[in-house]
Amino acid sequence: MSTEPEASAQPLPAQQSAALFRLMTWLSPAFPVGAFSYSSGIEWAVEAGDVEGAASLRDWLDAMLQHGAGFCDAVLLCYAYRATERHDDASLLAVAELAAAFVTSAERQLETLSQGRAFIEIARKAWNSDGLGRAVAACGEAIAYPVAVGVVSASHGVSLPATLHGFLHAVTSNWISAGARLIPLGQTDSQRVLAALEPAVIATGSRALAASLDDLGTATFRADLASLRHETQYTRLFRS
């Protein structure tokens, strides 16, 4: 075995390495946006018996990704990213206001706005830039989580496709984490669910990149109802 480095093993360019480092940091479970305290209605779905194990959790999340909040948030992220990249303050404000309103319940609004606010605050303290400050100001007071991720990534030159797929992976992982604590599921079963959802994450990201705001909408009535009913659920671990 040779101890000499292979010529084909070239390092990533510095700019790509920095972008990857930042994206992995921002979308890591360790990034303090409080995602662990939200279940997006999954807690009620478990209580009601709609989600009982790994298979039903996978099916529930597949629908949320492709036909529910996952797809809608992905589209909103894309529009926020592009508006930031173009320095189009009017469009950025419009998409920020739409994202803050385009939620199915008061708890879902709390979830997305709280995480968005935390994401912006930490990102600005650790990776601030003049462009980021300008974009944040253009968004107005309410910044939903997907808008926050799009704005920060665009301001730092992280590519939109990478940002989008990283965001969907992070959201899906958090949903699975909530389900694992509630059902409960073991670590191996949780990873099997995540692996099974890989095609849905990829497909949702691809659709969102090509979607218009007219494509926003959900076909996940039961999941939307779960988010509403969670507001009056008697015993709860999660805020949504």
UniProtKB/Swiss-Prot annotation:
Cellular component terms per the entry's GO annotation: cytoplasm
Gene3D superfamilies: Urease accessory protein UreF (1.10.4190.10)
InterPro entries associated with the record: UreF, UreF_sf
Leader sequence residues: none
Pfam families in UniProt: UreF
Compartments, as annotated in UniProt: Cytoplasm
Domain of life of the organism encoding this protein: Bacteria
Major place of residence: cytoplasm
Ribonucleoprotein in keyword set: no
Keywords: Chaperone, Cytoplasm, Nickel insertion
Chaperone as UniProt keyword: yes
Molecular-function GO term, any one: nickel cation binding
PANTHER family membership: UREASE ACCESSORY PROTEIN F (PTHR33620:SF1)
Membership in a protein family: Belongs to the UreF family.
Purpose of the protein: Required for maturation of urease via the functional incorporation of the urease nickel metallocenter.
Subunit relationships: UreD, UreF and UreG form a complex that acts as a GTP-hydrolysis-dependent molecular chaperone, activating the urease apoprotein by helping to assemble the nickel containing metallocenter of UreC. The UreE protein probably delivers the nickel.
Protein name, entry field: Urease accessory protein UreF
Annotated organism of origin: Rhodopseudomonas palustris (strain ATCC BAA-98 / CGA009)
